[in-house]
Amino acid sequence: MKVHMHTKFCLICLLTFIFHHCNHCHEEHDHGPEALHRQHRGMTELEPSKFSKQAAENEKKYYIEKLFERYGENGRLSFFGLEKLLTNLGLGERKVVEINHEDLGHDHVSHLDILAVQEGKHFHSHNHQHSHNHLNSENQTVTSVSTKRNHKCDPEKETVEVSVKSDDKHMHDHNHRLRHHHRLHHHLDHNNTHHFHNDSITPSERGEPSNEPSTETNKTQEQSDVKLPKGKRKKKGRKSNENSEVITPGFPPNHDQGEQYEHNRVHKPDRVHNPGHSHVHLPERNGHDPGRGHQDLDPDNEGELRHTRKREAPHVKNNAIISLRKDLNEDDHHHECLNVTQLLKYYGHGANSPISTDLFTYLCPALLYQIDSRLCIEHFDKLLVEDINKDKNLVPEDEANIGASAWICGIISITVISLLSLLGVILVPIINQGCFKFLLTFLVALAVGTMSGDALLHLLPHSQGGHDHSHQHAHGHGHSHGHESNKFLEEYDAVLKGLVALGGIYLLFIIEHCIRMFKHYKQQRGKQKWFMKQNTEESTIGRKLSDHKLNNTPDSDWLQLKPLAGTDDSVVSEDRLNETELTDLEGQQESPPKNYLCIEEEKIIDHSHSDGLHTIHEHDLHAAAHNHHGENKTVLRKHNHQWHHKHSHHSHGPCHSGSDLKETGIANIAWMVIMGDGIHNFSDGLAIGAAFSAGLTGGISTSIAVFCHELPHELGDFAVLLKAGMTVKQAIVYNLLSAMMAYIGMLIGTAVGQYANNITLWIFAVTAGMFLYVALVDMLPEMLHGDGDNEEHGFCPVGQFILQNLGLLFGFAIMLVIALYEDKIVFDIQF
C-alpha cells in the first residue's frame, strides 16, 4: 500500500514538473528582471485570495509610480504630462490611417506604428526586418516557441493524450490563466501586436465564485485540455473553481457591479481568437461600431464558437441586454475620441489641477476602453466609403439644399471679387502723380505674374489631375528621407514643371529688358556728344548774330528798307526774313536722326532757336511800335508754333507719350485689356461655379485663390486703362462691365459642374489658356514697350526694371504658395 501511494505521489510530481517546464518553454521570450517579477506575480496568484488583493495593490502602485516617474513630477501628473501619455497611446485626437497595412495587421499597436511612420517619427527599412514590424516578428516568435514546445514537450504527448472537447465545461488550463494574468498587467509595456480583449463583466471580476471558465483564447497559443481519469478530472474541476475566485488585479473583492459600470463604462463582447488567422470585424453586443470587435470565422473554429455560445448562462445574456439598453441611453461622449480636457471634465476634474494617483486609477479604465474600442483611429478608406454612402443616401431635399447652397455661395463669392474693381477709386485721389506712376509700373508686372502663375501653377496641374492626393502605398514600411523627397517630387510634379516654365518666361524677359537698357544708354551717350557739338555751333552762330551790323543800325535805316523791297507790306518782309533764317537753322539741325529725338531734345532745340530769334523779335517789336501794326507778334507766334509742331513728331518709337494715345482716342491695348479682363472674369466664374458644385470646401478654396490673384490683377488692369488714355470714371465703368461676365461664367460653371462633372477639368484647361494669352500677349508687351514717356517725369530705366521684377516675382510667389498649400485650406460650412 505504501509503495502504491509513493508511486502515485511520484507521478503527480512528474506531471507537475512537466507542466511547469512547458509553461517555461512557452514564456521563453520574457527575459530579465521584469520577467522574474511577472513570474513572482504568477506564483502569488496561486496563493489564497486574501493575499491576492495585496499583490494587486502592489502591482498597481508599481506601474502607477513608473508612469508618474515618466510623465509626472513630484508624485503628481500635470495636464501636459497626461496629454503626452495620451498621445503616446494614440488617444486624445482622431487620427486617419492612410497607409495600406494589410500585412501589418489591424491591432492598436500596429495602427500606432503606422501613424508614427505616417507622421515621420520613425521609418521602416526595406532591407531588413524592422523591430516595429510587430506582426511578422510576433509570428516568428510564435513559430519558434511552438517548435521548441514540440521538441521539448514530446514526453508529455507520449504520456498524456491531448484533446479538445466542446462539452467539457470545467476543464481550464492553469497556465493559460497565469499568462492571462501576465498579459493584463503588461499590455502597455509589452512590445507586441496583440491587443488584450477583456470579456464582459463576469462574476469572477465582482469577486463572486463562478462555475463558468473564461472563454478567451490567445492568438499566440493553443487551448488544450488534458484528458485525465474521472477522479482527477473532478479534482481539476474543483481547482478551476478555486482559481476562478482569484480577484483580477485592479478590482477589489467588494467592488459592486454598478460601481464598476459607473467608473469603467466597459462592456466587452465574447471574443474568440484562433492563431494564424486574420480578424474579421463583426458587430458587438454593446451597440458600438461594427468594426471594433474581432471574431475568427475559420471553419475549424466553428465548433468552438458554438461551444462558447452554448456555455453562456441566461443571466449573462440578460445582463448584456440590460447593458445595451443602458448604452443607448448614455451620452454620445462615451463613443467619441476624448482629449485630455474632455476626459478630465467628464470625471469632474479641472484641466489646471494636478492629477493624483487615485484619480489616475479611475482614468485607467477609460483609457483602456478608448484603446480597445479604437475610437481615435480611422481608416482613410472607411472615410471615403462613408462619404460615398452619404452621397448615395442623400434625400432629394438634401440634394436640393446642396444645389441651392452652391448657387448662393457662388453669387456671394463673385460679388466680393467683383468689388475689387472699385479699389482704383480709392487709390487715385490719395496718391500723387509721381507715386502713382511707380504704383502703376508695379501693378502691371504684378498682374502679369499672378495671371501667368495661376495658369501654369494652379489651373494646368488641376486640369491634368495633378492634385489627386489618394496616395496609397502597397507597402506600409520602407520609408526613408530619400523616399520622402521623392514623394514630394511625385506629388507636385506638374506644379514644379509649371514653375520651370515660368522661369523660362522670366529669363527671356530679363534678357530682352537688359538688351533694351543697353541700347538706351548707348543712344543716350551718342545724343550727349551730338548735343555738346551742337551747343558749340549754336553759340558761335549766336555770337555772329550779335555782332552783325544790323544790330547797330538805327530804326530809320530799317524804315528805309521797305521801299527797296518793292512793297509796303512789312509783314511779308518779315515773313521772308524769318523764312530765310529758319531755313538756315533747319538745314543745320537736320543732321541727327529723327527717330531718336525725344521731348527733352525738342525743349533744348526750342530753347536754342528762341535765343537765335531773340534779336529779330526785338526789331519786329520796334517796327510795330513805329508803324502801329499789331500783326507782327501774331505772325511770329504762329510761325514758331509751326516750327515746334514740325519737330514734335520726330519720334514714334519707344519715346512716345501718353498724349499721343489721347489724341487718337482709346488705344487698341485698352480694348484688348477690357476684352481680356471680361474673358478672364468669365473663366473665373466658370472655375468658381464648378468648384462650388463639387463641394463647399473646394468652392471656398478656389474663391480664395481667385481673390488672391484677382486683387493685383484688377488694380493692374485699372492702371493699364489709365495709361491707355481713359479717365477714372471710364475705367471704373468698363471694369464693372467686365466683372458682370463673372456672373455668367459662374452660372454656367455651376450648372455644368452639377450635371456634367467630367467637363470641370476641361474648364480649368481653357481658363489657363485664356490667362496666358491676356498676360503674355496684352500685358507683357505693355511692360516692355509702354514706359518710354516716363522719362519726362524723372523715371529711369533701372528703376522701372527693378519695379517690374519685384511685381513679377511677387506674383509668382503668391501663386506658388497657393498651389503648394491650397489643400490645407479646408472649410466645413453647412447650411
Curated annotation (Swiss-Prot):
Principal localization reads membrane
Leader sequence segment: 1-25
What the record says about the induction of its expression is: Up-regulated in several breast cancer lines, and correlated to cancer progression as a marker of metastatic breast cancer.
Q: Which residues carry this modification: Phosphothreonine?
A: T536, T553
Report the domain of life of the source organism: Eukaryota
Q: What positions are modified (Phosphoserine)?
A: S591
Compositional bias ranges of the Basic residues kind: 172-188, 229-238
Give any GO molecular function from the UniProt entry. Answer: protein tyrosine phosphatase activator activity
Basic and acidic residues: which segments have biased composition?
152-171, 189-198, 256-273, 281-315
Q: How is it modified after translation?
A: Undergoes N-terminal ectodomain shedding.
Tell me what topology the record assigns in the membrane. Multi-pass membrane protein
**Positions bearing carbohydrate:** N139, N198, N218, N339
Q: Which reaction does it catalyse?
A: Zn(2+)(in) = Zn(2+)(out)
Q: Which GO terms describe its biological process?
A: epithelial to mesenchymal transition; intracellular monoatomic cation homeostasis; intracellular zinc ion homeostasis; negative regulation of B cell apoptotic process; positive regulation of B cell proliferation; positive regulation of B cell receptor signaling pathway; zinc ion import across plasma membrane; zinc ion transmembrane transport
Q: Where in the cell is it found?
A: Cell membrane; Apical cell membrane
Region annotated Disordered, chain positions: 126-318, 464-484
* Any Pfam family matching the protein: Zip
User: What residue spans carry the Polar residues bias annotation?
Assistant: 138-147, 211-221
Q: Which UniProt keywords apply?
A: Cell membrane, Glycoprotein, Ion transport, Membrane, Phosphoprotein, Signal, Transmembrane, Transmembrane helix, Transport, Zinc, Zinc transport
GO annotations of cellular component type: apical plasma membrane; plasma membrane
Segments passing through the bilayer: 411-431, 438-458, 495-515, 687-707, 732-752, 759-779, 801-821
- Summarize subunit and interaction data from the UniProt record for this chain: Interacts with SLC39A6; which triggers cells to undergo EMT and mitosis. Found in a complex with SLC39A6, SLC39A10 and with the 'Ser-727' phosphorylated form of STAT3 throughout mitosis. Found in a complex with SLC39A6, SLC39A10 and with NCAM1; this complex controls NCAM1 phosphorylation and integration into focal adhesion complexes during epithelial-tomesenchymal transition. Found in a complex with SLC39A6, SLC39A10 and with GSK3B that controls NCAM1 phosphorylation.
Question: Which protein family is named in the record?
Answer: Belongs to the ZIP transporter (TC 2.A.5) family.
Its biological purpose: Zinc-influx transporter. When associated with SLC39A6, the heterodimer formed by SLC39A10 and SLC39A6 mediates cellular zinc uptake to trigger cells to undergo epithelial-to-mesenchymal transition (EMT). SLC39A10-SLC39A6 heterodimers play also an essentiel role in initiating mitosis by importing zinc into cells to initiate a pathway resulting in the onset of mitosis. Plays an important for both mature B-cell maintenance and humoral immune responses. When associated with SLC39A10, the heterodimer controls NCAM1 phosphorylation and integration into focal adhesion complexes during EMT.
User: Mind telling me what this protein is named?
Assistant: Zinc transporter ZIP10
Q: Which gene encodes it?
A: SLC39A10
